[in-house]
Every structure is written in structure tokens, then in C-alpha cells.
Swiss-Prot record:
Record-given protein name: Large ribosomal subunit protein bL32c
UniProt keyword annotation of Translocase present: no
Pfam families, A to Z: Ribosomal_L32p
Key word Coiled coil present: no
GO annotation terms (biological process): translation
Example of a GO MF term: structural constituent of ribosome
UniProt entry keywords in alphabetical sequence: Chloroplast, Plastid, Ribonucleoprotein, Ribosomal protein
SUPFAM superfamilies: Zn-binding ribosomal proteins
Amino acid sequence: MAVPKKRTSISKKHIRRNFWKRKGYWAAVKAFSLAKSISTGYSKGFFVRQKK
């Protein structure tokens, strides 16, 4: 089993965590943008059934 030789510095830990959080933030922004375009009807990549 692999074991780290030295302790990871706090700054490196913060950098990695911030990078991870930023990825989640951009995924949420994209999802919200897609939901907005579908709800307004401006989406060109989807076919949404309209209720009659």
C-alpha cells in the first residue's frame, strides 16, 4: 500500500481544495444555464415536448 513520505503542506491542500470547488462551481453554472435556456425555449440542442 502506498504511503506518503511527507506531510502535504497546508497551502498545497488549500490549492487542491479550491481547484476541486471551482470545478463544482462551473458545473453548477453550466447546469443552471442549460436549465434556463430550456425553460425559456431558446435551447437548440434539445427537443422538449410542449404540453398542449
